[in-house]
Amino acid sequence: MSMQTEQELVALCLALIKDQDSLSAAEKKLTKTTPVSALKPREIDTIRKRSRAGLTHSANVLFDPLGHRAPRAGAVYTPAPIVRSMMTWLAAQGSPARIVDPGAGSGRFILAAGEAFPDAQLVAVEMDPLAALMLRANLSARGWTDRATVMVKDYREVKLPPCAGITAFIGNPPYVRHHDIGEDWKAWYASNFAGYGIKASALAGLHLHFFLQTRLLAKAGDVGAFITSAEWMDVNYGSALRRLLLDELGGIALHVLEPTVEAFPGTATTAAIACFRVGETARPVRVRFIDELTNLNGLTKGTDIPREQLQAASRWSIIVRPSAPAMAGDIELGELFRVHRGQVTGANGIWIAGEHAQGLPDRVKMPAVTKAKDLIQAGAHLNSAEVLRRVIDLPTDLDDFTKEERRRISSFLSWAKLHGADQSYIAQHRRAWWSVGLKAPAPILCTYMARRPPQFTLNACDARHINIAHGLYPREPLAAGIMASLVTWLNKNINTGSGRTYAGGLTKFEPKEIERLRIPSLENLHA
């Protein structure tokens, strides 16, 4: 039986929940206009029994009759084999007196924990009132209302009473990017990290906030395992979490799941399961790269890495998944090239020329690569700038223009100011707000964010580029034939494994990651 509307789902939840006095104000608001469930008592009893059974006939799918609606923003349901492996790991750490799921949804983790630890108190935190109703219904169907507490609030606001035994934290914190996090919470994040002597970036996503809040709530000896997207292992804003795991949260294991494992179905992203025991600062961290669900093995296997090695590493992915052994004579691309991201305009709609720029002198409208597609379609050689758009690149000093040119430029700048071009963060930090400052043409250009390996392209037409591409600039002059051979080699041999895979399956290569790519020596390349 399927619920066709949200009201039907709410009605079913209410039919399953015995103690409705405990509902939060947000949940009660959802129920005000909900009619009595049209399901017959026998049908409701069937749902209750199936929910209590916990699993369907498929060994790989949790039976969660109230959890297959579209999840809340930032939430993606975790496949059952991963949930079970995390529970197996947790069981090996002892018997927790309390289990906390910080982003419980309809209860996938907390229900599995309730089965695995029948004597533990359950604490489920969930902001979405509909998901919280589904969670309560699932708990009620299992008869666990007395041992469970559901908090309908932001996990960062949660306070936990003292607990005599071990508290275990487990779950899949929601993925919300920093753009959607308020300034007050960003300040909270930085301030609390500073309390541990750690500098934290405001670019961190919500899942990193959840790790921090867990440390604030936990005491020595508490344990946990969270599965999140894995980008924090490498990016600059993840450095605070990396330190927290080693120095404060007691990280003891890190299992990284290839996108093909689909830890977050439909997202094709790399996932990481971080396991911790608060207070642990000496033992090695067990790390492993997993390319199939069948290799999870209860999160027991892996290679033990000294904490000092992780502390010294600027990126953890190269430790979890070391690069292939270097061939004799191989070098890093960065020995030959400096790699620079393209210029940020601050307002592409204004600075990429269109009808609004028709009156400007041609000499300030530079042919430029403005889309990754420009390079992908060009392939190994960008021979002509005819197909490229133009970027308006005015100098800081406008005195060299003729009187007529100045008049047209002034008219354009008045229009640009009217549209807020001078108010962007980028514009306000330029020497002159109107001067984009495009970099010199790079002999080789490459894409850096796509669901495919980077496209390396010889820039035969001296096009400029904005920040959708990287430019490769030789440290010393190189012959055209050598650069052509290098581009051919890079396009044949570089894959997405050298970058970082984000939610949505996008693989990103930062400039330093391009510089670290291993390539044949010039002698071998041109042989």
From Swiss-Prot:
Residues making up the signal peptide according to the UniProt record: none
Enzyme class name: transferase
EC number: 2.1.1.72
Stretches of the chain forming a coiled coil according to its record: none
Keywords of the record: DNA-binding, Methyltransferase, Restriction system, S-adenosyl-L-methionine, Transferase
InterPro entries assigned to the protein according to its UniProt record, in alphabetical order: MethylTrfase_TaqI-like_dom, N4_N6_ade-DNA_methylase, SAM-dependent_MTases_sf
Example GO BP: DNA restriction-modification system
CDD domains: AdoMet_MTases
Catalytic activity: a 2'-deoxyadenosine in DNA + S-adenosyl-L-methionine = an N(6)-methyl-2'-deoxyadenosine in DNA + S-adenosyl-L-homocysteine + H(+)
One MF annotation (Gene Ontology) recorded for this entry: DNA binding
Keyword flag Lipid biosynthesis: no
Gene3D superfamilies: Vaccinia Virus protein VP39 (3.40.50.150)
Family in the record: Belongs to the N(4)/N(6)-methyltransferase family.
PANTHER family: DNA METHYLASE (MODIFICATION METHYLASE) (METHYLTRANSFERASE)-RELATED, DNA METHYLTRANSFERASE YEEA-RELATED
Protein name (record): Type II methyltransferase M.XamI
